A protein has these predicted regions:
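Short, low-complexity intrinsically disordered segments enriched in small and basic residues
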Residues: 203, 215-216
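Accessible peptide chain termini
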Residues: 1, 224-225
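Basic polycationic patches enriched in arginine
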Residues: 196, 201-202, 208, 224
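Short, intrinsically disordered C-terminal tails of secreted or membrane-associated proteins
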Residues: 218-224
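N-terminal membrane-targeting hydrophobic helices
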Residues: 1-195, 200
Length: 225
């Protein structure tokens, strides 16, 4: 699937747990990490008409879609995270969500499936493929991406943070403000009990919910709206 789809998948998945902004970003990026092996397409395209073309994409694509790199990604997540064990485990699961999505719909326009060499570099015996895998640009992938984008915007409206927080807290606040002005709710205007979340945002209600396990009255507002 598209890296955009993988990114949105990682973000939505990261919101299934109570994580600090840094850890949310780590879990989200873990869902995109396998596609680092796709960066070889840049030198391949730049050198395709030269006397010595670099076939880095053709040769190495999916070389990081492996259990070994999943463990490396989880290890890096563990080291960088503030909530280490939780973030490391979620990063490992987020990585595997990427593999699952590729099995669903990553077939090329020529009909070729990119097998996932899950056990490399230790073994080449297991090559993951799926009969009926749809093309990379097929309508199910588009629908999945649109649904994930909708959930991402809903999370921003509901909780007060979006993937934009990874690069700018100010831009994140502006997005949330715009969403809440466009789709107002009285809870955002008439606050109940006010507390402070671990990531510095104001919380309305007595308990912060997760996407997977929602609870009544859990609403996040940015510090300034």
């Amino acid at each position: 699937m598209s890296p955009v789809t993988h990114f949105l998948t990682g973000w939505v998945f990261a919101n299934c747990a109570k994580l600090k902004p840094r850890d949310r970003a780590i879990v989200t990026l873990a869902s995109v990490a396998p596609d680092l092996d796709g960066l070889g397409i840049i030198p391949e395209l730049l050198t395709r008409n030269s006397s010595h073309p670099l076939l880095w994409f053709s040769v190495y694509h999916h070389s990081l879609h492996t259990l070994a790199f999943a463990l490396v990604t989880a290890g890096v997540a563990f080291v960088l995270a503030t909530q280490r064990w939780k973030t490391g485990l979620l990063a490992l699961l987020s990585f595997h969500l990427h593999l699952a999505e590729d099995l669903l719909g990553a077939r090329g326009p020529d009909g070729y499936q990119w097998p996932i060499p899950y056990l490399k570099p230790f073994s080449s015996t297991l090559q993951l493929t799926r009969q009926g895998q749809w093309q990379w640009n097929a309508w199910p992938n588009i629908v999945i991406t649109v649904v994930l984008l909708g959930i991402t915007l809903w999370l921003a409206w509901r909780r007060g943070f979006s993937p934009i927080e990874m690069i700018s807290a100010k831009l994140n606040r502006e997005l949330v403000t715009a969403l809440r002005r466009r789709f107002p709710r009285k809870e955002f205007l008439n606050s109940g009990s006010v507390g402070t979340s671990l990531d510095g945002r104001r919380i309305l209600g007595t308990h912060r919910s997760s996407l997977c396990f929602p609870s009544a009255g859990a609403l996040l507002l940015p510090a300034r709206i």
